[in-house]
């Protein structure tokens, strides 16, 4: 270790920053969060620093450097672009025995600003000793995703109880075990879920129960130190009580398949689960992020093939929670958009099972974004409607007259297998046969494919290209923007402007579309591209529709 990590108490202590530019601003921002009284010394000080340090506790001095301003400083920061001046500041601070940091000059620094993960009062500093600050920032970014914001509130709560815990639990071992149970159990779960009052009440109840179960006996060692100990049976009983409490169910949206689209909260709950019940639309990459030793149970539904009926899934969730387990119900997309999450929490509520719901990116959002098809656009669409192709008990959704607004985008979930019925019904109801429509298959995944056409042509195009499920349909004028706005997997494009025009559609960069005079595939290229398409599992659903806009 070339440097020793220390945490300075700078609240209401003077810190001198020499320099008034962007570098000084970054340091002032960090130091102000620690409560320091900051003096900025520079002939010119930018407006951002002026706004940041507008409080009367800070001081802005519009003067050239003079070492007399170092008086009473706790630390000094040299943040100028004048190398000679920075050396002088270092020499003056060293002579006064005041720690100094010369920005971006490690050999002139008595201390280094680490990359900081702030969960006040929990603070983590990461330093490369000035060797690779970018790497330190990357490590910090990784830690930011792993450490919930609730840890700060949890630490503050522990601080409030520290005295009571010490008074009621006489041994160090007993206190350590108490805090381990609190930080790994119900108290932390409540805090992370944002239920601060319930977390406080739970911690108080845990402390009272622990104190009541402790049998303490005083003893004194040869040095006269107290060695009162908690009996082993009492500690064992506490652990048993903690393990036998009611579990909790987390209804988690797994998103469209790309694991990078998971929320931080989803990832945290997945990694603390005892058992995971997952759907067919949960990608292997997402499932792999669950806790390694958690039980993983497939309860997915495919078209005309339900591994476990919904009532059976509800029962599994209830029973697992009653066993005291932390249960993750992992659902593709978002639990509340054609995901039957509402039915599951109704069942949990009926059995008084605690639960949380974590939203996910629904397939419509992912498919539109990754296909370059904005669901709304000021020039094309002022609202968006999410519709299922099938209603409850598998009945087809034939409410075509609801989908005739040309200023609205309509997204059909679970509509690929009924594509001929949908397109014919829409045209018969009065929708123009030239209305643009797209099929997006495996949205957000490396094998994503997009097929564009019109209501009149899309069935024939799909018969030729056979895009696999899972897939959804996007209908509306916004689909016409796909050709210009598509961005995903462009490195896989096979684009040939020299081939002769044909009547066939063509596949480009995972995108099959109607032919353009300036971009055609020849027959060999088309056959090669289409051979890359594989049939995946289909999907099913039985809710009606959601209108947004």
Curated annotation (Swiss-Prot):
The keyword S-adenosyl-L-methionine applies. S-adenosyl-L-methionine binds at residues 256, 332-334, 337, 362-363, 414, 443. Keywords: Cobalamin biosynthesis, Lyase, Methyltransferase, Multifunctional enzyme, NAD, Oxidoreductase, Phosphoprotein, Porphyrin biosynthesis, S-adenosyl-L-methionine, Transferase. Its EC number is 2.1.1.107, 1.3.1.76, 4.99.1.4. SUPFAM superfamilies: NAD(P)-binding Rossmann-fold domains, Siroheme synthase middle domains-like, Tetrapyrrole methylase. Residues 1-203 are annotated as: Precorrin-2 dehydrogenase /sirohydrochlorin ferrochelatase. Signal peptide: none annotated. It comes from the Bacteria. Pathway: Cofactor biosynthesis; adenosylcobalamin biosynthesis; precorrin-2 from uroporphyrinogen III: step 1/1; Cofactor biosynthesis; adenosylcobalamin biosynthesis; sirohydrochlorin from precorrin-2: step 1/1; Porphyrin-containing compound metabolism; siroheme biosynthesis; precorrin-2 from uroporphyrinogen III: step 1/1; Porphyrin-containing compound metabolism; siroheme biosynthesis; siroheme from sirohydrochlorin: step 1/1. InterPro entries: 4pyrrol_Mease (IPR000878), 4pyrrol_Methylase_sf (IPR035996), 4pyrrole_Mease_sub1 (IPR014777), 4pyrrole_Mease_sub2 (IPR014776), CobA/CysG_C (IPR006366), NAD(P)-bd_dom_sf (IPR036291), Siro_Cobalamin_biosynth (IPR050161), Sirohaem_synt_dimer_dom_sf (IPR037115). The modification Phosphoserine is found at residue 128. The active site is at residues 279, 301. CDD domains: SUMT. It catalyses: uroporphyrinogen III + 2 S-adenosyl-L-methionine = precorrin-2 + 2 S-adenosyl-L-homocysteine + H(+); precorrin-2 + NAD(+) = sirohydrochlorin + NADH + 2 H(+); siroheme + 2 H(+) = sirohydrochlorin + Fe(2+). The keyword Metal-binding does not apply. Pfam families: CysG_dimeriser (PF10414), NAD_binding_7 (PF13241), Sirohm_synth_M (PF14824), TP_methylase (PF00590). Residues 247-549 are annotated as: Uroporphyrinogen-III C-methyltransferase. Then it catalyzes the NAD-dependent ring dehydrogenation of precorrin-2 to yield sirohydrochlorin. Finally, it catalyzes the ferrochelation of sirohydrochlorin to yield siroheme. In the N-terminal section; belongs to the precorrin-2 dehydrogenase / sirohydrochlorin ferrochelatase family. In the C-terminal section; belongs to the precorrin methyltransferase family. This is Siroheme synthase. It comes from Psychrobacter arcticus (strain DSM 17307 / VKM B-2377 / 273-4).
């Amino acid at each position: 270790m070339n440097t020793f990590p220390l945490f300075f108490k700078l609240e209401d202590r003077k810190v001198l920053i020499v320099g008034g530019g962007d570098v000084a601003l970054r340091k002032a921002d960090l130091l102000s969060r620690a409560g320091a009284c900051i003096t900025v010394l520079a002939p010119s000080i930018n407006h951002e620093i002026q706004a940041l340090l507008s409080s009367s506790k800070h001081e802005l001095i519009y003067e050239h450097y003079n070492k007399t301003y170092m008086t009473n400083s706790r630390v000094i920061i040299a943040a100028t672009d004048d190398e000679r001046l920075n050396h002088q500041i270092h020499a003056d601070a060293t002579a006064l025995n005041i720690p100094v940091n010369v920005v971006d000059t490690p050999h002139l620094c008595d201390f280094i600003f680490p990359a900081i993960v702030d969960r006040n009062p929990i603070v983590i500093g990461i330093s490369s000793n000035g060797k690779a600050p970018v790497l330190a920032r990357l490590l910090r970014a990784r830690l930011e995703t792993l450490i919930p914001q609730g840890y700060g509130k949890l630490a503050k709560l522990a601080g409030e109880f520290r005295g009571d815990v010490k008074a009621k639990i006489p041994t160090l071992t007993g206190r350590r075990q108490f805090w381990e149970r609190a930080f790994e159990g119900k108290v932390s779960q409540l805090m992370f879920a944002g239920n601060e009052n319930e977390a406080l009440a739970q911690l108080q109840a845990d402390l009272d129960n622990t104190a009541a179960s402790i049998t303490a006996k005083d003893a004194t060692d040869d040095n006269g130190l107290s060695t009162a100990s908690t009996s082993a049976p009492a500690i064992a009983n506490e652990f048993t009580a903690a393990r036998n409490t009611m579990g909790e169910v987390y209804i988690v949206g797994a998103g469209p398949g790309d694991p990078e689209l998971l929320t931080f909260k989803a990832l945290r709950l997945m990694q603390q689960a005892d058992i995971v019940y997952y759907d067919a639309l949960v990608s292997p990459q997402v499932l792999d992020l669950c806790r390694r030793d958690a039980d993983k149970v497939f309860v997915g539904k495919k078209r005309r093939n339900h591994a476990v009926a919904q009532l059976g899934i509800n029962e599994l969730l209830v029973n697992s929670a009653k066993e005291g387990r932390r249960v993750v119900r992992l659902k593709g997309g978002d639990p509340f958009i054609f995901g039957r999450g509402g039915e599951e929490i109704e069942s949990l509520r009926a059995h008084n099972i605690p639960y949380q719901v974590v939203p996910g990116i629904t397939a419509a959002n992912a498919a539109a974004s990754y296909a370059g098809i904005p669901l709304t656009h000021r020039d094309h669409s002022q609202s968006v409607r999410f519709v299922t192709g099938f209603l409850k008990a598998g009945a087809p959704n034939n409410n075509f007259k609801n989908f005739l607004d040309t200023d609205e985008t309509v997204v059909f979930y679970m509509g690929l297998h009924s594509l001929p019925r949908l397109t014919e019904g829409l045209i018969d109801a009065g929708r123009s046969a030239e209305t643009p429509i797209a099929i997006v298959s495996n949205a957000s995944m490396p094998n994503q494919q997009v097929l564009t056409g019109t209501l009149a042509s899309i069935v024939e195009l799909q018969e030729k290209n056979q895009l696999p499920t899972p897939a959804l349909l996007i209908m509306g004028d916004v689909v016409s923007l796909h050709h210009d706005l598509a961005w995903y997997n462009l490195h896989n494009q096979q684009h040939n402007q020299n081939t002769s025009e044909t009547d066939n559609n063509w596949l480009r960069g995972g995108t099959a579309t109607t032919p353009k005079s300036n971009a055609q595939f020849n027959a060999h290229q088309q056959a090669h591209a289409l051979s890359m398409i594989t049939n995946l599992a289909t999907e099913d659903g039985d809710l009606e529709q959601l209108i947004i806009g």
